[in-house]
């Protein structure tokens, strides 16, 4: 089993009036000893690119697979065991809109859809 934290922006971060087209998230962290096992698990409703220490680790161009979130959500898991090193490491994510965050919100009452609060 694994443990994880849910990461999201505040509700005020991106609205119809102030859109952020491709948020870039970056986190530096220190590792004091060699890693025995580590993985990154990502599940999102839009597309992303993941980088570790400046190297792209994303499996494909459109990650994750496109799905209908009312039925199924896919996740990607990346084994980072051999990629992490003692000392400073940097994880970065470039987020894209995907199918569920397309323009046209005023028409579809976009501000109030359930998945926007995730």
Give the ranges of each region predicted by the language model.
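Accessory beta-strand-rich segments of carbohydrate-active enzymes
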Residues: 14-15, 20, 25-118
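Boundary/junction segments of secreted and surface-exposed precursor proteins
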Residues: 1-13
């Amino acid at each position: 089993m694994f443990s994880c934290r849910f990461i999201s922006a505040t509700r005020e971060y991106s609205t119809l009036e102030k859109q952020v087209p491709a948020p870039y998230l970056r986190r530096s962290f220190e590792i004091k000893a060699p890693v025995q096992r580590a993985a990154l698990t990502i599940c999102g409703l839009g597309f992303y690119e993941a980088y570790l220490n400046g190297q792209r680790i994303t499996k494909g161009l459109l990650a994750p697979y496109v799905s209908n979130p009312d039925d199924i959500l896919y996740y990607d898991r990346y084994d980072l065991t051999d990629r992490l090193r003692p000392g400073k490491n940097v994880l970065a994510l470039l987020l894209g809109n995907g199918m569920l965050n397309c323009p046209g919100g005023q028409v579809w009452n976009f501000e109030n859809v359930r998945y926007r609060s995730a």
